[in-house]
Amino acid sequence: MFNILKQVSDYAKGSIQAAKYIGEGLSVTFDHMRRRPITVQYPYEKLIPSERYRGRIHFEFDKCIACEVCVRVCPINLPVVDWTFNKEIKKKELKHYSIDFGVCIFCGNCVEYCPTNCLSMTEEYELASYDRHELNYDNVALGRLPYKVTQDPMVTPLRELGYLPKGVIEPHDLPAGSQRAGKRPEEITD
């Protein structure tokens, strides 16, 4: 008889212990159900990157002294720096700077070791494209145009297409009364 009572008491203890474990498991489940979802609907909602996020590199043309430190510290020798030596002022003049983000590993060495701080990491992470050649960013795509943009051969033809509001002085280096390539809105007739 004592054997049966012992079995019943063991069964009751086991049932209570099983209910306790099930209750603990359900409490964890309900805690997770009450939390906000971590998943975001990416194209419509975007998470804000952290302060030190290493995204696309921003380049400032005017600060660069063409020292090529960025090329030497890059593990894959990625930045392409084209420069000429100006004998009059005895300094290097930067002609072209480009980085191929299809190859870049975003280590940040170029930004860290740049002596003039002309390189900086942005929070931009959307670099996807259908053509890998679109990921090769030149000095204009990496940042802003140089101060002497009126002497840039790539920008000069585009400047002639610009329209100036009434009363504004003519653009630099254009003769007065020169024809624009396009028509003003009031010159267009249906």
UniProtKB/Swiss-Prot annotation:
Family: Belongs to the complex I 23 kDa subunit family.
Binding site for [4Fe-4S] cluster 1: 64, 67, 70, 114
Source taxon at top rank: Bacteria
Main location per the UniProt record: membrane
Subcellular compartments: Cellular thylakoid membrane
InterPro entries: 4Fe4S_Fe-S-bd, 4Fe4S_Fe_S_CS, NADH_quinone_OxRdtase_chainI, NDHI
Requisite cofactors: [4Fe-4S] cluster
Subunit description: NDH-1 is composed of at least 11 different subunits.
GO cellular component, one term: plasma membrane-derived thylakoid membrane
NCBIfam families noted in UniProt: ndhI, NuoI, PRK05888.1-3
Highest classification ranks of the organism: Bacteria, Bacillati, Cyanobacteriota, Cyanophyceae, Oscillatoriophycideae
One Gene Ontology MF term: 4 iron, 4 sulfur cluster binding
Gene Ontology biological-process entries: photosynthesis, light reaction
Keywords from the UniProt entry: 4Fe-4S, Iron, Iron-sulfur, Membrane, Metal-binding, NAD, NADP, Plastoquinone, Quinone, Repeat, Thylakoid, Translocase
Main function: NDH-1 shuttles electrons from an unknown electron donor, via FMN and iron-sulfur (Fe-S) centers, to quinones in the respiratory and/or the photosynthetic chain. The immediate electron acceptor for the enzyme in this species is believed to be plastoquinone. Couples the redox reaction to proton translocation, and thus conserves the redox energy in a proton gradient.
Coiled-coil region: none
Protein name, entry field: NAD(P)H-quinone oxidoreductase subunit I
Listed EC numbers: 7.1.1.-
Residues that hold [4Fe-4S] cluster 2 according to the record: 74, 104, 107, 110
Entry's cofactor comment: Binds 2 [4Fe-4S] clusters per subunit.
Pfam families in the cross-refs: Fer4_7 (PF12838)
Region (Disordered): 169-190
Source species: Microcystis aeruginosa (strain NIES-843 / IAM M-2473)
